[in-house]
Regions:
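Mature extracytoplasmic or organellar-lumen-exposed domains after removal of signal/transit peptides
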Residues: 1-231
Length: 231
């Protein structure tokens, strides 16, 4: 989508200074945001695959490599996780081949495990800041999705939905942390994900919900404030 390069400034010397990106975003936060961006596409793809929308699922499974991987490749190599490219490529290929959902889910689990290992190299404060940044990217995508107050672009809606699922899962884990500051900040972020739920219907954007991007932008701002408490 049009807002998809928004969080890449930190890696490639100014790559992707799209809407929603901060010019001074910390390289670690930018990297973590991009990692979440990739996982969000895969989460959306997995849910769509399970729902039987294979065409949309294949599109989302392919996007991490097509749109984002080069922005994180160098850092992943430095951290010793260069094999993530092959893991994600294999997952996308399995989706294209229409393998069983169980196989797809298992492969996604391996990708997520690698993501979790990568995240252990970064402190909680930077992870929390990346959730705020990713919510801002979600808001940019969502604004395109509901332009004119109707569901105009379901692909961008899927993107936003997937990004919020990543934040929900990761902040939920940090909320259980032994670090009281990080735990409290993460719990506040989980609350913002829940509040932003009013901007979403079901996976395909059906149902009664508020088609208002400001809900997500407000959630991002509150997450950013919450993340400062973890420093």
């Amino acid at each position: 989508g049009e807002g998809e390069a928004a969080a890449s400034e930190g890696e490639g010397g100014g790559e992707g200074e799209g809407e929603g990106g901060g010019a001074a975003i910390d390289p670690d936060v930018a990297f973590l945001t991009d990692l979440g961006f990739m996982e969000g596409h895969l989460r959306a793809g997995l849910a769509l695959y399970e729902a039987g929308d294979l065409s949309a699922a294949k599109t989302h499974m392919g996007h991490p490599i097509e749109e984002k991987y080069e922005a994180v490749a160098k850092r992943l190599d430095q951290l010793g996780y260069g094999d993530l490219r092959e893991q994600i490529s294999a997952l996308a290929a399995a989706a294209e081949a229409e393998d069983s959902y169980e196989k797809i889910a298992e492969m996604f689990g391996k990708v997520r495990q690698t993501h979790e290992e990568v995240r252990t190299n970064f402190d909680a404060a930077d992870q929390l800041k990346s959730f705020a940044a990713l919510t801002r990217v979600a808001a940019d995508e969502y604004a395109i999705a509901v332009e004119g107050g109707t569901l105009a672009n379901v692909k961008e809606y899927h993107d936003a939905w997937g990004f919020m699922r990543v934040i929900e899962a990761e902040a939920g884990e940090l909320a259980a942390s032994d670090d009281a500051k990080a735990s409290d900040a993460a719990a506040a972020i989980v609350e913002q994900v829940e509040a932003a739920g009013s901007a979403f219907g079901d996976l395909q954007g059906q149902g009664d919900y508020e088609k208002d991007p400001s809900i997500l932008y407000a959630a991002a701002a509150r997450m950013e404030l919450a993340s400062l408490g973890a420093e």
